[in-house]
Amino acid sequence: MLTYENPIIPGFYPDPSICRVGEDYYLVNSSFEFFPGVPLWHSRDLFHWEQIGHVLTRDSQLPLQNCNTSGGIYAPTIRFRDGRFYMITTNVSNGGNFFVWTDDIRGEWSEPVYIDQGGIDPSLFWDDDGTVYYTGTHSDENGLPGIGMFPVDLETGARLGETKIIWYGTGGKCPEGPHIYKINGWYYLMIAEGGTEYGHMETIARSRSVWGPYESCPHNPIVTHRNAHREVDFHAVGHADLVEAPDGKWWMVCHAIRPSVFMLHHTGRETMLLPVEWDENGWPVVNENKYITAEMQAEGEGDVRVQRSWRDDFTADAPAPRWAYLRNPDRSRYAFGGGLTLHGSADTLDDLGAPTFLAVRQQQFALRYETQMQLSGHADAAAGLTIFHTNEHHYELLARPAESGLAVQLRRRAVDMQTLSEPVVFENTGTLVLRIEAERMKYTFLAGPDASRLRVIGTGSTQLLSTECMNCTFTGCFAGMFAEGDCTAHFAYFSVEDAREA
């Protein structure tokens, strides 16, 4: 048997949607206030995934100015039809629902085509007669939420009919994330319910007509951990999409969370892979109705593990796809090649602007982040490493220029609680090695003139950066580099090591 690891895409990569073209699978995730938008992944076997870019790479496609925390890009759907890829999503901060398209999955995507429809979580379905249907969240005249549908013109984005609610779900709150599939003469409508927290679930219904009425699956929900005991590997399972492999087997991608301590999580909602079978009555059975586990088995041979350790020396003239900016970046403040140079600005990590910030998603609990930084500038400026979740929840290992060297401090913010440690001055140097050691329950921040002479500057609890300690956030923790104020910081490298191997 083949053993693979869940999550297949770890870290803040929620709301997965998938399609297959021949032997190739493509998957996208939501990205909220981070830029570029909608991470784009490729696989040949569903187990090994490579990020090949993003769908939304231009400011004109993705305006995020002054976007609130967990604003921006919500759940996307990716589909392929007649030689063309389509990605439809919602920018809840600027513009609403829209789709883009491309004929080259590794190339540029079109400008947005906006659709005059409220709600979130849009999806597209092509019927046998060529009619294209839009589905998404919608409320009826009494305010009851459900899934709305109407035919749409993909040339213009124009609605070709009125919105009709085709299913209200099974009674769980927040019916959302709809996808329609036509399988063996049935129209299957699969949705998420229960909210994206610990009551999350996936349900399905079917009809002989695309307009319904839809019959609910007798064993709904088809996926959930809402009743699971605390010790299971994952919670908040839902928001799924289905794909058929070339061999006729079916698979589901969905997201879930990994609690770090008790019922708190800080790495965000992560992408999972589950096998699907169809029972004698034509209903899907997901993962044999068992709980999702960190180690899964499938037909084949091998042991598939996600990459935990890597290093970036920033030799290219642009960041690799794994890197993210916060909102639309001022590109004049970033220089790549022979390391990374950041020029600070007036925007800080406390603001809803576009601070000088480049980071990657935290993908495991036990990791070691390290960089070598050279800093020059005004004494009030700061640069260094950050663990960032939102503008109100972040920790920084920062350095400031001092008369005789560099002064290092640990800055911690959790809503209105802010602390700044006493400065530790490293004499006669403008260069430091900075390290963050991540564990399940805490971060340890270290600095020194080189990697063999590091000094602990302080620690910070992961609990205060957990989603459950925040006011409505759908993202997860990032680790990376920043610069604030009048300064220039040069980073020779950024490395991530699997701390389990230490």
Residue ranges of model-derived segments:
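Carbohydrate-active catalytic/glycan-binding domains of CAZyme proteins
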Residues: 1-502
